[in-house]
Amino acid sequence: MGKTIAINAGSSTLKFKLFEMPQERVIAQGAVERIGFKTSPVNIRYGVDHHYQEKAVVADHLAAVNIVLDELIKLRIIDSYDEITGVGHRVVAGGEQFHDSVLITDQVLKQITDLAEYAPLHNPANAVGIRAFKRVLPHVPAVAVFDTAFHASMPAVNYLYSLPYDYYQRYGARKFGAHGTSHRYVAVRAAKLLGRPLETLKLITLHLGAGSSITAIDHGQSLDTSMGFTPLAGITMATRSGDVDPSLVAYLMKKLNISDPDEMLTILNTQSGLLGLAGSADMQELEARYDEDSQAQLAIDIFVNRIVKYVGAYLAELQGADALVITAGIGERDARMRQRIADRLTYFGVAIDPTKNQVSGVERDLSTTDAKIRTLLIPTDEELMIARDVERVAQNQ
C-alpha cells in the first residue's frame, strides 16, 4: 500500500491530489497559485472537512513542490517523503510519439520539452513540474499521462487535414485532440453506470468547461474529437474561438495590422469565445444575464449550437449512440445548459427528465424512461485516472 500524487503543473500553478492506492482513497488535494509572484496562495484540503490556507513566497515550481510536501508532513497527512511511492504528471501534448502513459526518463522528458510547439501554453509548464519533483523525489517512479494519448486510436480519415500530405509527414500537421484523460475516465464510468462492458458501447462524451471538447467513442476507442492540432479548435469556449475559417484569420490580421501570428493566436485563445461574444468568460454570469441580455443569450445559444452540430456529426459517424456523457465544470453544474442541449437532440431520441436534471456534480442517469439514447451526468476525475496509470505503468516496469 502506497501513496500516489497526481500533478497538474501550469505556468504559475501547481495543483495536486494525493491518493492512497490501490484503494483510490483521496487523502488530500490542493494547489499553489501565483508561483513567482510576491505572494502565492497555498490551499490544501484533507480529512473530512479540513482546509489549510496560507500565503507564502514561492519563487519557482521547485519551491512549490517543497512547500506542498513539507505541509503534508506538518499537517500529519504523511509522516515522510518515503510514503509517496508514485508521481503522475498531466502532460497536454504527446504528439505521435506517445500513445499511452509512460515512465518518465531523461529521454521522455526531452521529448515532452521538444513537443512544446504543439502545446506552447502547457508542455513547458508540465516539464517544469516534472523536473521539480525529480529534484525532490529522485527515486520515486514518475509517470507522464498525456491528454492526447486516448485519441491515438483515431483513424487517419479523422486526424488528417486536407493539406499537402508532406506537411503531415514533415511537420506533424494533424489533429491530436485534448482532454483525453477526462474522456477516458467518464467513458469507463459510463460503462459501469450502464452495466455493460465499455467494449460494447458507442458513446459521445461532452467535456464542457472553460476549455470544451466532444469525443466520439466507439467500443472504448476514440474515433473522433472536436479539438484539433491544438486545443483551440472545436466548439465555442470560455475565451477560445473554436473553429474559424482560416481565411478569416488572414483577413483580420490584415485589417488589424498584425504581422506576428502569435499576436493573432493570443486573440483567438484569450479574447474570443464567450468573452468575445458577451464580455464575460463566466458561464454562471452569462446564465444570470440570459433572460435580460441579448448578447449573453446569443453567446449561450452559439455555444449550444456548436455542441449540437458536433453531436449530430458524431451520431452519424458512430451510426447511433448508446449514451451522451456530460462532464466538467459547465456540464456538471449547469442544469439549464444540459436541458438546452437535450432539447435540441430530441430527434435522435435524447430526452432528459427535468426532475432528475436538478442536480449538480453528482453521478446520475438523467434520461427519461423512454429515451433511446441515455444521457449521463458523470463528474470527471482526471487525477484518479492519472493515479491509476501510475500504478499500472510502474508495476509493468
UniProtKB/Swiss-Prot annotation:
A GO molecular function held by the record: magnesium ion binding
Listed InterPro entries: Ac/propionate_kinase (IPR004372), Aliphatic_acid_kin_short-chain (IPR000890), Aliphatic_acid_kinase_CS (IPR023865), ATPase_NBD (IPR043129)
Known catalytic reactions: acetate + ATP = acetyl phosphate + ADP
Subcellular localization, as worded in the UniProt entry: Cytoplasm
Binding site for ATP: K15, H207, L208, G209, A210, G211
Listed cofactors: Mg(2+); Mn(2+)
Keyword Ligase set for record: no
Cofactor, how bound (note): Mg(2+). Can also accept Mn(2+).
Active site per the UniProt annotation: D147
PROSITE patterns per record: ACETATE_KINASE_1 (PS01075), ACETATE_KINASE_2 (PS01076)
Binding site for Mg(2+): N8, E382
GO cellular component term of the entry, any: cytoplasm
Residues the record lists as binding substrate: R90
Claim: Magnesium is one of the keywords in the record: yes
GO BP terms: acetate metabolic process; acetyl-CoA biosynthetic process
EC annotation from Swiss-Prot or TrEMBL: 2.7.2.1
Record site: Transition state stabilizer: H179, R240
Pathway: Metabolic intermediate biosynthesis; acetyl-CoA biosynthesis; acetyl-CoA from acetate: step 1/2
Subunit structure: Homodimer.
Family under the similarity heading: Belongs to the acetokinase family.
NCBIfam families in alphabetical order: ackA
Role this protein plays: Catalyzes the formation of acetyl phosphate from acetate and ATP. Can also catalyze the reverse reaction.
Protein name: Acetate kinase
Organism of derivation: Lactiplantibacillus plantarum (strain ATCC BAA-793 / NCIMB 8826 / WCFS1) (Lactobacillus plantarum)
